[in-house]
Amino acid sequence: MAPKKKVVGLIKLQIKAGEANPAPPVGPALGQHGVNIMEFCKAYNAATESQRGNVIPVEISVYEDRSFTFALKTPPAAKLLLKAAGVPKGSGEPHKTKVAKVSWDQVREIAETKKEDLNANDIDAAAKIIAGTARSMGITVE
């Protein structure tokens, strides 16, 4: 069995699906760890092609031989809520000004999508987490 490679860096980025390019923020973040930037961009774009338009967080593990692996996460709850509510951005003062409404069904659907990345035991707990995110963005849950 090959010896286990040593991880020397962990990079977390949020990039639009299928749109990774060497420009900031991707280039500088990978460059300082000595990763082949174009190789990552091609691999990321190929892996996220089906989810174009969404922002997909990625966690990149960089090894001492400058190779890397990456794990894709689910889109941020805030982005999914904005899309469901049909508004461009959340409220500047969320507890005073409400910008939109979403139904519990939409919240549960987002919770289903996010379940693997949330620290929740069941869908109801995950839905409460998503509802809390909505509340802090000035989106009412009904």
UniProtKB/Swiss-Prot annotation:
| One annotated GO molecular function | large ribosomal subunit rRNA binding
Q: Which SMART domains match?
A: RL11
CC per GO annotation:
cytosolic large ribosomal subunit
> What CDD domains does the database record attribute to this sequence?
Ribosomal_L11
InterPro entries given for it? Ribosomal_uL11, Ribosomal_uL11_bac-typ, Ribosomal_uL11_C, Ribosomal_uL11_C_sf, Ribosomal_uL11_CS, Ribosomal_uL11_N, Ribosomal_uL11_N_sf
The protein's UniProt keywords, in alphabetical order, are: Methylation, Ribonucleoprotein, Ribosomal protein, RNA-binding, rRNA-binding
Q: Record's Pfam families?
A: Ribosomal_L11, Ribosomal_L11_N
Name of the protein in question: Large ribosomal subunit protein uL11
Functionally, this protein is described as follows:
Forms part of the ribosomal stalk which helps the ribosome interact with GTP-bound translation factors.
Give the GO biological process terms. translation
Outline the subunit composition.
Part of the ribosomal stalk of the 50S ribosomal subunit. Interacts with L10 and the large rRNA to form the base of the stalk. L10 forms an elongated spine to which L12 dimers bind in a sequential fashion forming a multimeric L10(L12)X complex.
Residues spanning the signal sequence:
none
Which NCBIfam families does the protein's record reference? L11_bact
Q: How is it modified after translation?
A: One or more lysine residues are methylated.
Entry similarity comment: Belongs to the universal ribosomal protein uL11 family.
